Amino acid sequence: MVPEYSRFYNILGYNFKDCTLLIRALTHRSKTKKNYERLEFLGDSVLSFVIAEVLYKQFTDLAEGKLSQLRSKLVKGTTLAQLASSLKMDEYIILGASEQGGHKREKILEDVFEAVIGAIYLDSDFATVKKVILKWYQPIISSINLDTIKVKDSKSKLQEILLQNALSLPEYSIETIDGKDHEQQFTVVAVSKDLNLRVKAQGTSRKKAEQKTAEKMIEMLSQQGLHEKK
């Protein structure tokens, strides 16, 4: 165990065998090319599956749309940033000179949270990282009140509208990324092949841009008479 990380290991509830994985998971691209971005990509997928599985098993009467809505709530940026802060990840993030002061930024915390999950997965196995994730999420999952889950995020709402009308889901892609690291603007394009629609919007993160793109597509569908069925 690397001494300076012993406290962090205790907070995470996991001891890394290969500490270089953890260091990379904590390193922002403003510091070096060997940063957390690839681990973030991996961790995002691992987290999404673990949460989907636990919700599927715990809420056996929920329809697919409600499960998707609930998962979106649990893996959204704000939730991940809050969990990262509670695990003191902000105290260990490694930033370059251009990003100093960014330890508390929601986007960076969200990315690091997913990257640490990716690092734990590579350092161990799926069963281990699943156990760690569920420990972190236990207070949130145990406090879920289905009666209070009313507001859908735009991507989930769009998904329900399309599925209810037997239409394929849109494909999201990044068109451009403008600005410096700490003030980037993402332009995302959403394409619905079945409806021959192409919509774009901007946001300060990919996820925010995707949500705005979904909002625009919902408005266009509404004009065509396609609404969410209650």
Curated annotation (Swiss-Prot):
EC number in record: 3.1.26.3
Coiled-coil segments on the chain, per record: none
GO annotation, biological process: mRNA processing; regulation of gene expression; rRNA processing; tRNA processing
Catalytic residue list: 44, 114
Cell location: Cytoplasm
Primary location class: cytoplasm
Cofactors named for this entry: Mg(2+)
Every DRBM domain range: 153-223
CDD domains given in the database record: DSRM_RNAse_III_family, RIBOc
Pfam families found in the cross-reference section: dsrm, Ribonucleas_3_3
Reaction equations catalysed: Endonucleolytic cleavage to 5'-phosphomonoester
Matching SUPFAM superfamilies: dsRNA-binding domain-like (SSF54768), RNase III domain-like (SSF69065)
Sequence positions that bind Mg(2+): 40, 111, 114
GO CC, any one term: cytoplasm
Keywords tagged on the record: Cytoplasm, Endonuclease, Hydrolase, Magnesium, Metal-binding, mRNA processing, Nuclease, RNA-binding, rRNA processing, rRNA-binding, tRNA processing
Keyword Aminoacyl-tRNA synthetase included in the entry's annotation: no
Domain RNase III: 5-125
Annotated InterPro entries: dsRBD_dom, RNase_III, RNase_III_dom, RNase_III_sf
A GO MF label: rRNA binding
Protein family per UniProt: Belongs to the ribonuclease III family.
Record function comment: Digests double-stranded RNA. Involved in the processing of primary rRNA transcript to yield the immediate precursors to the large and small rRNAs (23S and 16S). Processes some mRNAs, and tRNAs when they are encoded in the rRNA operon. Processes pre-crRNA and tracrRNA of type II CRISPR loci if present in the organism.
Subunit relationships: Homodimer.
Name of the protein in question: Ribonuclease 3
Taxonomic source organism: Francisella tularensis subsp. tularensis (strain WY96-3418)
Lineage: Bacteria, Pseudomonadati, Pseudomonadota, Gammaproteobacteria, Thiotrichales
Gene coding for it: rnc
